[in-house]
């Protein structure tokens, strides 16, 4: 079972792949898809889509775990995040992956035991929970690993 964790964003999208073999978790890969705010939005979304598609084709995940969005006080920011999620969900649908959505507090509680944990705490815990993640320093990638971990430990496969 391979889960693709996705921390959706328009500027810095984090992704990570974690596999589960019997009861053992294995980190496979992670990365950040960066787009520039000065580029046109349709080009940014196309870049996210094509880059994430390469990840899906290379690793063949079974499931995509994506963070649910919350409504930001800045409606433009929320709308742009919605665009990114739409592009991601379209790709997930195109490759017929099972999709799971998790609230940020659920992910934090699953990984750290505390639903309001800081990014540093998530980063610290994933390094202790999943072998091979000790070189991750980026919070976007750490969040994506945490999403994949949450999927693997809370769902029955």
UniProtKB/Swiss-Prot annotation:
Family membership noted in the UniProt record: Belongs to the RuvC family.
Record-listed Mg(2+) 2 binding positions: 67
An individual GO BP term: DNA repair
InterPro entries per UniProt: RNaseH-like_sf (IPR012337), RNaseH_sf (IPR036397), X-over_junc_endoDNase_Mg_BS (IPR020563), X-over_junc_endoDNase_RuvC (IPR002176)
Main subcellular localisation: cytoplasm
Descriptive protein name: Crossover junction endodeoxyribonuclease RuvC
SUPFAM superfamilies linked: Ribonuclease H-like
Gene3D superfamilies: Ribonuclease H-like superfamily/Ribonuclease H (3.30.420.10)
Disulfide pairings: none
Cofactor stoichiometry and binding remark: Binds 2 Mg(2+) ion per subunit.
Organism: Rickettsia typhi (strain ATCC VR-144 / Wilmington)
Top-level taxonomy: Bacteria, Pseudomonadati, Pseudomonadota, Alphaproteobacteria, Rickettsiales
EC number: 3.1.21.10
Subunit structure of this chain's protein: Homodimer which binds Holliday junction (HJ) DNA. The HJ becomes 2-fold symmetrical on binding to RuvC with unstacked arms; it has a different conformation from HJ DNA in complex with RuvA. In the full resolvosome a probable DNA-RuvA(4)-RuvB(12)-RuvC(2) complex forms which resolves the HJ.
Residues the entry annotates as binding Mg(2+) 1: 7, 140
Catalytic activity: Endonucleolytic cleavage at a junction such as a reciprocal single-stranded crossover between two homologous DNA duplexes (Holliday junction)
């Amino acid at each position: 079972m391979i889960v693709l964790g996705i921390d959706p964003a328009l500027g810095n999208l984090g992704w990570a792949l974690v596999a589960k073999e019997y009861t053992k978790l294995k980190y496979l890969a992670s990365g950040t898809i960066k787009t520039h705010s000065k580029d046109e939005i349709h080009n940014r979304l196309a870049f996210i889509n094509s880059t994430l598609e390469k990840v899906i084709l290379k690793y063949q995940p079974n499931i995509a775990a994506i963070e649910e969005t919350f409504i930001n006080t800045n409606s433009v920011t929320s709308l742009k995040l919605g665009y990114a999620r739409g592009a991601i969900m379209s790709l997930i649908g195109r490759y017929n992956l099972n999709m799971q959505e998790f609230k940020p507090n659920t992910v934090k509680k699953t990984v750290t035991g505390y639903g309001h944990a800081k990014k540093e705490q998530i980063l610290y815990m994933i390094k202790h929970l999943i072998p091979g993640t000790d070189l991750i320093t980026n919070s976007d990638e750490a969040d994506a690993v945490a999403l994949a971990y949450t999927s693997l430990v809370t769902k029955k496969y």
